[in-house]
């Protein structure tokens, strides 16, 4: 019987090797190592942060993002309008530590009333190929609780390349900053449609007349989905003479939603992982890839589209992540002594243990260490 248990254990240990990643480096870093994907939706900053240059491709733009964000460089990357996303990984899997926030992701919120919320997705490299092509789960936020009936799950949007970059001129009134009103057409899977408008380059000194559609994308359409659409958070509190836009922060759970100095509000717990559409909770032990996307589809006067920005991310418990990876590679799962364990436990001599204390045990062919 014991030989059978150990054989099952050995097989399980082999399978778990591919699911945890730890690069061969002298010293592990808690910061981003590589940006795997950068696919922004159209927006006023997408060809500027990072800067597009003739000849750039999806790969070179992702590399530019890496140079701006890796190793805590604190550069600024814009994700454009709704759905635009960035995917990154560290030099190791991030462990899900029970009862604690696991990752901090920073935006560029300048103050209250300027929230541009982004949703976080997480994935585990289950097939072991080092690519972000496995199942993705969402980290739910406060809108699941306080905006019931206002959130759209399974939302999809398609942007169409503009037919012209020719400015139509100032339109007057509350839209006096708009130079192309019907600029970039969007359609969604809810029967909705509309246009991103273009604002005057004079509004921002960094503008250089670039298109809002990503210039390295060769397709004439960009589709993002199936994702979650948060309700609008932007309101014009001014009048017809002067706009004053406020974009209210959500309670918790979103990137670029609170100021970076608020560490707790910029920290996120893998225990909040859910399936995107059904919202079924998912237990995630390790995360290899993280994705952030702009979660609202709105335009706010002279501010134009709401676009999530990213300035960095870090593992909030580096040492624990590394130790748990080592345990997993050895076929050992760490659990707390107070954790309820369903099923029978055996010690390494094959004896059934009714009241386990701290130590190493076997359950269903897998090793557990109780700390």
Role assignments for model-derived ranges:
Residues 1-20, 332:
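Bacterial Sec-dependent N-terminal signal peptides
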Residues 117-119, 342:
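Exposed beta-strand and adjacent loop surfaces of beta-rich binding modules
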Residues 322-349:
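Residue-level detector of functionally pivotal "anchor" positions at catalytic/ligand-binding pockets or at interdomain
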Residues 121-125:
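Predominantly extracellular/luminal cell-surface or secreted proteins
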Residues 20-116, 140-328:
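A domain-level signal for the mature, folded cores of soluble proteins
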Residues 126-135, 151:
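Acidic, glycine-anchored loop motifs typical of Ca2+
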Residues 360-371:
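C-terminal tail/sorting-segment detector
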């Amino acid at each position: 019987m014991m030989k059978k248990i150990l054989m099952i254990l050995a097989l399980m240990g082999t399978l778990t090797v591919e699911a945890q990643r730890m690069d061969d480096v002298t010293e592990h870093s808690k910061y981003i190592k590589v940006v795997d994907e950068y696919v922004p939706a159209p927006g006023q900053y997408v060809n500027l942060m990072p800067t597009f240059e003739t000849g750039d491709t999806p790969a070179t733009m992702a590399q530019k993002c890496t140079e701006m964000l890796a190793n805590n460089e604190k550069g600024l990357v814009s994700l454009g309008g709704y759905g635009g996303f960035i995917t990154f990984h560290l030099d190791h899997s991030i462990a899900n530590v029970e009862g604690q926030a696991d990752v901090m992701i920073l935006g560029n919120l300048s103050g209250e009333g300027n929230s541009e919320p982004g949703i976080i997705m997480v994935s585990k490299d289950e097939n072991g190929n080092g690519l972000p092509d496995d199942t993705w789960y969402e980290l739910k936020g406060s809108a699941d609780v306080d905006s019931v009936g206002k959130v759209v799950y399974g939302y999809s949007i398609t942007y169409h390349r503009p037919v012209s970059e020719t400015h139509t001129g100032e339109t007057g009134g509350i839209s006096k900053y708009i130079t192309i009103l019907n600029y970039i057409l969007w359609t969604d899977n809810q029967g909705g449609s509309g246009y991103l408008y273009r604002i005057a380059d004079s509004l921002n000194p960094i503008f250089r007349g670039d298109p809002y559609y990503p210039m390295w994308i060769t397709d004439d359409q960009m589709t993002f989905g199936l994702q979650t659409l948060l309700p609008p958070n932007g309101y014009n509190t001014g009048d017809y003479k002067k706009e004053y836009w406020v974009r209210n922060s959500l309670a918790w759970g979103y990137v670029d939603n609170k100021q970076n100095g608020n560490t707790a509000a910029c920290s996120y717990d893998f225990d909040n992982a859910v399936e995107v559409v059904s919202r079924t909770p998912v237990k995630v032990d390790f995360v290899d890839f993280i994705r952030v996307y702009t979660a609202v589809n709105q335009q706010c006067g002279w501010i134009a589209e709401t676009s999530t920005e990213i300035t960095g991310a870090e593992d909030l418990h580096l040492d624990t992540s590394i130790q748990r990876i080592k345990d997993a590679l050895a076929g050992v799962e760490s659990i707390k002594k107070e954790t309820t364990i369903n099923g029978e436990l055996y010690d390494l001599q094959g004896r059934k243990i009714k009241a386990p204390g701290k130590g190493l045990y076997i359950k269903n062919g897998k090793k557990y260490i109780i700390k």
